[in-house]
């Protein structure tokens, strides 16, 4: 053999190489022979690979290796036969066999008429490579086993994959669909049902560690799942894994619970596929981000290595592009597209490309997908999908919850919203409605009143009897995770992060320096827009999910990060928002009657200011300035006027916000910048002078105001509120940390993971982006929860295989909109009498049920899921997520249920390879 042969990476990262030492100058001869004996010879390799050598060298003594070399692979031997084969005393050989079984070099069963115990030298995969990885303590002591498994499940297949026929040719594993996805399929055969195999091995089940999850975790590419108890050994294999400390017996009900939890998490059911149609020895529940069996089809783009006899199909009329099937699809077969007709497609719904297959095409590494774990998570086709879902920073399934609301399924609608937005009642009142700006219906008449429908749905959260508390969906069989996570700041980003961590099975602790949660939602937004009981109700849901809230605690002052680390906290999410304001740097601004907007709003919302007299001047033109002006009007200020640099067209505040401010009595003067604040003899504000702003931005669009110093305007004032920007007040929070700060003192972090230069500190919301909207912070908190979950689970990658969140909107100029009737947009009733009686209470009413029905009927239903049958592996997970009965499995590929024994592999490959060669030669499809 050639020594120091290379590992095979196939353009994937060569992970785990650090666990493979250089081959010794004089390798152990017995181990070299064992490598030759056990290695799959399909490649006809003659090199000695380091990961093979060191794995066998650490697993076997020379004497054990010599015994193994005398055994034929997959041929069972009874104890008398092993005595005869080796010439060893019975007691000695039995102990050696049991020792090698415990290590994982051998397996055993009782598959003979006498039910005598017999030992088997298994193939590498599935076989000894898994067994070596299934006991965590052993794997941690011998991490080279992880590299061995990773390579042994890939390298031998590289040349064979295009020749694998439907059914898999006795190689590896085979997808078996979710039972309820095919339970009504009259054409199904028994081996396609999990129930068939559970019946066959009734009473003999054991739950064991997932070797793929364990292997990837050791090499730093774990998926953050707890590896324990996801794989179900059946029959004699159940006894083997229990007796060798790889698992424990479980009842049939416990098996059902494992299967249900696997489906909830989006794990694919697979069965072993090396013993023909009359035997399996395991049912695995696989995460495509780590599973080596699923990798065989996904890396090489050869689905025959995995797929079942079934293909998912979408009923477009029922589909609402909610994206649930897309998120869960392990093969990237389901993607979001459109169902509106396209001008470019000749007035028809566009057709979508299909994955090329090796059946009639020459296949080499250029056809592979080394980045499949990320590529399979791309959510939309390039041509785009529903603009509402795309435009929403949290990518809420707008089209989906509109349809559920139209059907009166309000609980399900609320559940769907909360998959991406845990604060829908809040957002129904204060969101800046980018979904409506993007709504295709706006090209017909007016955008659908999406936010008003969401507000109606989310009203259920305000009542303990109807609120929706999501169930915990956790990738651990232990019921949840015990790692302690601290969230600093109970604003929208922190609340969102707490919600999604709790949903994942954590019990995060939220530290809030104020006495109430919500951050700027509570202390910044006027109560006539957002009642505080709405915030409390949605926070209560998060508390019921398992989050703990500690109020009146300022991290950095009352407790430090290091002290929290000493208390066992493993990660921190810093989301303290922009709590300070900025001044203009002009004379007189240090007077007592000059304040910044965030301080003014905080005092109003805390009840410290309950009346105002005199004249109030607000400097600034954004939505926060509008809030200040409207509060001042309602508090009784005699004259309220806003001054901003921008023209009316350029003003950051929305047109709706400006209109409401004027209705409240505020005046708006555009094109003015502050020059000087005037004080009387007592040092109190008596006026302010403005100078004409002639230009706000330079030619590159950068903020660079220019003024006409000769065009001045002085106005009387009793107080001035500066609303020209916000600042971050860090205090001593980051003292001693490695967190780096950038422009405006914002924290620097990775744009996808939000991890800072201090690995256990993640940031989000306004401390990362600067002042933004609640929905942006909510989206950031969700992504941070994903990152933190991965961070605190040992050996997990923060990036590989996470949903990309790269949604693309369809081209609204391309869709055919002729033929749609105009339908007036519903408008929420404004109760002016209530507003007069209680100016700081909400006065905009929620839609009625009739209005919801009318408004949801206006949705054009732009998007739909598209399934590529060439990529679909028929797992059926998509069917478990769809709330609209819009996606089903059809038995289009019955030949994929052809299960043959491993020993028939070469004839099966040869027969199919001949057919394929003929197709390639003659160009047949």
Regions found by a protein language model. Name each.
Residues 74-86:
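Short acidic, hydrophobic short linear motifs in intrinsically disordered regions
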Residues 396-399, 405-406, 447-451, 487-555, ...:
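Beta1-alpha1 glycine-rich phosphate/pyrophosphate-binding loop at the start
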Residues 533-582, 595-612, 634-744:
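A Rossmann-like FAD-binding core segment of flavoenzymes
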Residues 86-102:
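Short amphipathic alpha-helical interaction segments
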Residues 457-478, 504, 537-557, 581-635, ...:
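Glycine-rich dinucleotide-binding loop and its adjacent helix/turn
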Residues 101-112, 334-335, 887:
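A short, conserved structural fragment
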Residues 115-154:
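Short, amphipathic alpha-helical interaction segments positioned at domain boundaries
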């Amino acid at each position: 053999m050639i020594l120091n042969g290379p590992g095979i990476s196939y353009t994937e990262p060569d992970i785990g190489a650090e666990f493979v030492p250089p081959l010794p100058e004089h390798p152990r001869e017995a181990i070299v022979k064992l490598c030759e004996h056990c290695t799959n010879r399909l490649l006809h390799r003659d090199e000695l690979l380091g990961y093979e050598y060191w794995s066998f060298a650490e697993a076997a003594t020379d004497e054990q290796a010599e015994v193994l070399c005398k055994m034929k692979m997959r041929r069972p031997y009874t104890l008398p036969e092993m005595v005869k084969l080796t010439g060893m005393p019975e007691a000695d050989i039995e102990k050696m066999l049991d020792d090698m079984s415990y290590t994982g070099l051998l397996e055993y069963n009782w598959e003979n008429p006498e039910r005598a115990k017999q030992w088997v030298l298994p193939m590498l995969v599935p076989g000894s490579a898994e067994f070596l990885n299934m006991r965590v303590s052993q794997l941690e002591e011998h991490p080279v086993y992880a590299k061995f498994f990773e390579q042994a499940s890939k390298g031998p297949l590289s040349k064979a994959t295009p020749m694998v026929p439907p059914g898999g040719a006795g190689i590896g594993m085979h997808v078996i669909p979710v039972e309820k996805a095919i339970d009504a399929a009259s054409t199904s055969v028994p081996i396609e049902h999990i129930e068939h195999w559970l019946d066959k091995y009734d009473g003999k089940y054991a739950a064991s560690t997932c070797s793929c999850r364990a292997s990837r975790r050791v090499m730093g590419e774990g998926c953050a799942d707890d590896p324990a108890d996801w794989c179900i050994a059946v029959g004699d294999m159940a006894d083997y894994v229990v007796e060798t400390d790889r698992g424990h017996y479980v009842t049939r009900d416990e098996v059902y619970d494992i299967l249900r939890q696997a489906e909830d998490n989006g794990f694919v059911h697979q069965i072993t596929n090396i013993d023909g149609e009359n035997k399996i020895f395991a049912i695995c529940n696989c995460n495509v981000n780590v599973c080596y069996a699923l990798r065989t089809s996904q890396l090489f783009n050869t689905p025959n290595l995995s797929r079942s006899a079934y293909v998912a199909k979408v009923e477009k009329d029922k589909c609402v592009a909610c994206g649930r099937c897309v998120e869960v699809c392990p093969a990237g077969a389901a993607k979001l597209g459109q169902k509106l007709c396209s001008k470019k497609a000749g007035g028809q719904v566009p057709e979508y490309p299909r994955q090329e297959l090796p059946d009639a095409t020459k296949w080499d590494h250029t056809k592979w997908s080394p980045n499949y774990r990320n590529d399979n998570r791309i959510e939309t086709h390039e041509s785009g999908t529903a603009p509402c879902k795309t435009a929403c920073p949290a990518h809420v399934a707008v089209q989906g919850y509109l349809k559920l609301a139209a059907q009166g399924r309000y609980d399900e609608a609320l559940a769907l919203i909360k998959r991406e937005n845990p604060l829908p009642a809040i957002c129904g009142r204060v969101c800046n409605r980018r979904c409506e700006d993007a709504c295709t219906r706006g090209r017909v008449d007016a955008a659908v009143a999406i936010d008003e429908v969401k507000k109606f749905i989310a009203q259920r959260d305000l009542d303990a009897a109807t609120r929706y508390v999501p169930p915990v969906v956790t990738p651990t069989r232990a019921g949840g995770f015990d790692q302690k996570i601290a969230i600093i700041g109970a604003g929208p980003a922190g609340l969102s992060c707490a919600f999604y961590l709790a949903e994942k099975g954590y019990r995060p602790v939220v530290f809030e320096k104020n006495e109430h949660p919500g951050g700027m939602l509570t202390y910044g937004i006027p109560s006539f827009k957002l009642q505080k009981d709405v915030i409390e109700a949605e926070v209560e849901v998060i508390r019921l999910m398992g989050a703990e809230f500690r109020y009146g605690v300022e991290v950095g002052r009352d407790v430090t990060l290091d002290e929290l680390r000493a208390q066992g906290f493993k990660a921190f999410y810093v989301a303290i928002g922009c709590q300070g304001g900025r001044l203009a740097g002009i004379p007189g601004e240090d007077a007592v009657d000059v304040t910044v907007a965030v301080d003014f709003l905080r005092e109003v919302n805390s009840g410290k200011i309950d009346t105002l007299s005199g004249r109030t001047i607000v400097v600034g033109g954004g939505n926060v300035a509008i809030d200040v002006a409207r509060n001042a009007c309602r508090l009784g200020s005699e004259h309220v006027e806003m001054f901003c640099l921008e023209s009316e067209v350029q003003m950051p505040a929305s047109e709706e916000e400006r209109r409401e401010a004027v209705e409240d009595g505020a005046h708006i003067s555009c094109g003015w910048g502050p020059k000087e604040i005037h004080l009387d003899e007592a040092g109190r504000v008596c006026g302010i002078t403005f100078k004409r702003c002639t230009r706000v931005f330079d030619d590159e669009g950068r903020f660079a105001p220019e003024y006409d110093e000769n065009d001045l305007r002085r106005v009387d004032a009793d107080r001035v509120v500066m609303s020209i920007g916000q600042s971050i007040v860090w205090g001593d929070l980051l003292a001693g940390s490695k967190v780096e700060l950038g422009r405006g003192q914002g924290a620097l972090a990775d744009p996808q993971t939000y991890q800072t230069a201090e690995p256990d500190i993640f940031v989000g919301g306004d401390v990362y982006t600067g002042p933004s909207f609640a929905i942006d912070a909510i989206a950031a908190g969700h992504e941070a929860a994903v990152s933190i979950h991965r961070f605190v689970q040992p050996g997990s990658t923060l990036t590989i295989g996470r949903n990309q969140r790269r949604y693309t909107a369809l081209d609204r100029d391309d869709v055919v909109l002729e033929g749609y009737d105009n339908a007036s947009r519903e408008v929420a009733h404004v109760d002016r009498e209530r507003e007069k009686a209680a100016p700081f209470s909400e006065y905009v009413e929620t839609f009625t049920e009739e209005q919801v029905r009318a408004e949801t009927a206006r949705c054009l239903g732009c998007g739909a899921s598209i399934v590529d049958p060439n990529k679909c592996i028929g797992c059926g997970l998509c069917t478990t997520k769809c709330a609209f009965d819009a996606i089903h499995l059809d038995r289009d590929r019955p030949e994929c249920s052809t299960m043959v024994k491993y020993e028939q592999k070469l004839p099966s490959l040869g027969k199919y390879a001949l057919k394929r060669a003929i197709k390639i030669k003659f160009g047949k499809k």
